[in-house]
């Protein structure tokens, strides 16, 4: 299996304490999603991997709904940390505001959901 040099960097970053959203951006079809799937396959952190490919651009609420799903799964698994990965996030209108709102809510409530966003 081919691993990009960024593989080890991302693998390391998701094990660090939650303090930054990890953003992976680049041209289409260069292997961003594949690399993240490889990292997740080697990680022991419970995760939810989603894609916004088929989400209507105006459905900004989808981000909050998926974040709630991640919170529920984290609670159900009684996990100390959880990883939410959203691929193609740039396809959703006002995605950055929605992500910031949920990130800030988790920061305030001391919820340990780490986030990886992918987009072109």
Ranges and model annotations:
Residues 1-120:
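Phosphate-binding site recognition
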């Amino acid at each position: 299996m081919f691993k990009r040099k960024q593989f080890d960097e991302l693998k390391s970053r998701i094990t660090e304490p939650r303090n930054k959203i990890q953003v992976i951006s680049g041209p289409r079809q260069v292997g961003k999603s594949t690399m993240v799937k490889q990292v997740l396959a080697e990680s022991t952190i419970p995760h939810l991997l989603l894609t916004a490919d088929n989400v209507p651009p105006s459905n900004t609420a989808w981000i909050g709904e998926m974040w709630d799903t991640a919170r529920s799964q984290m609670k159900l698994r009684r996990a100390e940390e959880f990883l939410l990965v959203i691929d193609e996030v740039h396809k959703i209108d006002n995605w950055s505001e929605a992500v910031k709102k949920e990130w800030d809510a988790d920061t305030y409530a001391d919820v340990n959901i780490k986030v990886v966003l992918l987009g072109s």
